[in-house]
A protein has these predicted regions:
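A hydrophobic, multi-pass inner-membrane permease signature
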Residues: 1-187
Length: 187
């Protein structure tokens, strides 16, 4: 959704461009609040579904402005005019001319959205009650909270529990960071 919207907003002759820009900018700075957000998700029947996690992150306004700026600065108007002369419509121009030139922004947006989804836990914490649907970060949070509690015993036992809890924290951080670290060199 971000790439086509960024392309559309980058066109100088798009009708209603200023209105749409304000439509995106105002909610970016002034959030509507958590309770209305929960009510909307509840009224749409998305509570305890995977869509409660996917749909809110389908468009990032910051990423939209990055793609808009990329298209404004990197796609020459001469190519767009040449495509029009050759008989290409808006969709054909976008898919055949613009997208091949936009591989860099496509890779960056894929990385940003992937890392954002990977690190996301707050929406899952609010909208998911079924623990089998929890993302990795929420499962790791539960493990870390459970490892913090000490049952008691002698000083040596408590020290061993503390060391084990610290090791569990470090392993959790590595496990949750490894896929993203493996992805970065290829983007």
């Amino acid at each position: 959704v971000t790439i086509p919207a960024g392309w559309a907003l980058s066109r100088k002759n798009m009708p209603g461009k200023k209105f749409l820009m304000m439509y995106f900018i105002i909610p970016m700075f002034f959030g509507g609040g958590l309770i209305p957000f929960y009510n909307v998700m509840s009224n749409l029947g998305l509570i305890n579904t995977i869509w409660a996690i996917v749909l809110p992150s389908i468009l990032s306004v910051w990423n939209l402005f990055m793609t808009k700026t990329f298209f404004e600065s990197s796609v020459p108007n001469g190519l767009i005019e040449a495509a029009k002369i050759d008989g290409a419509g808006h969709f054909r121009t976008f898919t055949s001319v613009v997208l091949p030139l936009a591989k860099a922004i496509l890779a960056v947006m894929a990385l940003y959205y992937a890392v954002g989804q990977w690190n996301s836990y707050f929406n899952a914490m609010i909208f998911l009650q079924d623990e089998s649907m929890y993302p990795l970060q929420l499962v790791l949070k539960e493990i870390l909270i459970a490892s913090e509690s000490t049952v008691g015993g002698s000083g040596e036992t408590i020290l061993q529990q503390y060391r084990l809890a610290n090791q569990l924290k470090y392993v959790s951080v590595i496990v949750s960071s490894l896929p993203v670290l493996m992805l970065y060199p290829f983007v």
